């Protein structure tokens, strides 16, 4: 009985709340203009935030064509030739027999530009300067010993002092030749790496040819041994 009374009370309570609850027409955000009644001034706009969602988005420059113009393809690059963008299927087998890796050396030399000539000359000077610097460092004692004046018996004359300045002048010339940009070193390293790759390619081709010859030789030897064994067995059975 108590449970029935409780359920009836809760139902009447919820009905009363639903009937007496009202949704306000507006929600005040700030207390500004709190003393002014908006009903007395209908022309004054009520401060608030209005959000409008557009029906569609049109790119600028295409609104005059039609009411619902199709947007342009953004992935397409204007001014590009469509035929040039076609992709070719790669070959299934890649071989070096038709065109080896050192085909650049077989072709005619590329026209040398003044910049490339300067880079090559600077690279050669740098390598020569490094070699001469190493030789001077290794033979520094010999140079100093040779540059020292030699005194003979009964004579007070000596070698002129200008010989002492020879190593200094050589080192100064080396410093001037070693002053260059890192791009020259990169180009020299790329050229040496390219030569090493070409040499490795040639060695690989020679090894492949030797391997093919060895396989052929082994096949012929195995076939001769098998034929010889078959002939011996046939002659033995004939006896």
Swiss-Prot record:
One of its GO terms (biological process) is protein targeting to mitochondrion. Residues 238-239 are extracellular. Residues 115-130 have a biased composition (Basic and acidic residues). Residues 107-139 are annotated as: Disordered. It is a single-pass type IV membrane protein. One of its GO terms (molecular function) is protein homodimerization activity. Belongs to the Tango11 family. Plays a role in mitochondrial and peroxisomal fission. Promotes the recruitment and association of the fission mediator dynamin-related protein 1 (DNM1L) to the mitochondrial surface. PANTHER family: MITOCHONDRIAL FISSION FACTOR (PTHR16501:SF17), TRANSPORT AND GOLGI ORGANIZATION PROTEIN 11 (PTHR16501). This is Mitochondrial fission factor homolog B. It comes from Xenopus laevis (African clawed frog). The gene is mff-b.
């Amino acid at each position: 009985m108590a449970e029935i009374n409780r359920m009836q009370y809760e139902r009447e309570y919820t009905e009363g709340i639903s009937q007496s609850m009202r949704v306000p027409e507006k929600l005040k955000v700030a207390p500004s203009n709190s003393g002014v009644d908006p009903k007395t001034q209908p022309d004054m706009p009520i401060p608030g935030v209005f959000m409008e969602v557009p029906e569609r988005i049109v790119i600028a420059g295409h609104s005059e064509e039609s009411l619902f113009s199709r947007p342009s393809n953004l992935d397409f690059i204007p001014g590009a030739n469509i035929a040039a963008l076609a992709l070719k299927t790669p070959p299934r087998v890649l071989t070096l027999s038709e065109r080896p890796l050192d085909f650049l050396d077989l072709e005619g030399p590329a026209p040398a530009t003044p910049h490339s000539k300067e880079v090559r000359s600077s690279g050669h000077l740098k390598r020569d300067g490094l070699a001469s610097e190493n030789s001077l460092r290794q033979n520094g004692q010999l140079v100093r010993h040779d540059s020292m004046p030699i005194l003979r018996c009964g004579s007070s004359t000596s070698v002129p002092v200008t010989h002492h300045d020879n190593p200094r002048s050589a080192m100064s010339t080396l410093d001037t030749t070693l002053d260059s940009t890192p791009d020259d070193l990169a180009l020299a390293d790329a050229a040496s790496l390219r030569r090493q790759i070409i040499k490795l390619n040639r060695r690989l081709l020679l090894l492949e040819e030797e391997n093919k010859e060895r396989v052929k030789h082994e096949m012929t030897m195995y076939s001769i041994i098998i034929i010889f064994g078959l002939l011996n067995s046939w002659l033995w059975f004939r006896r």
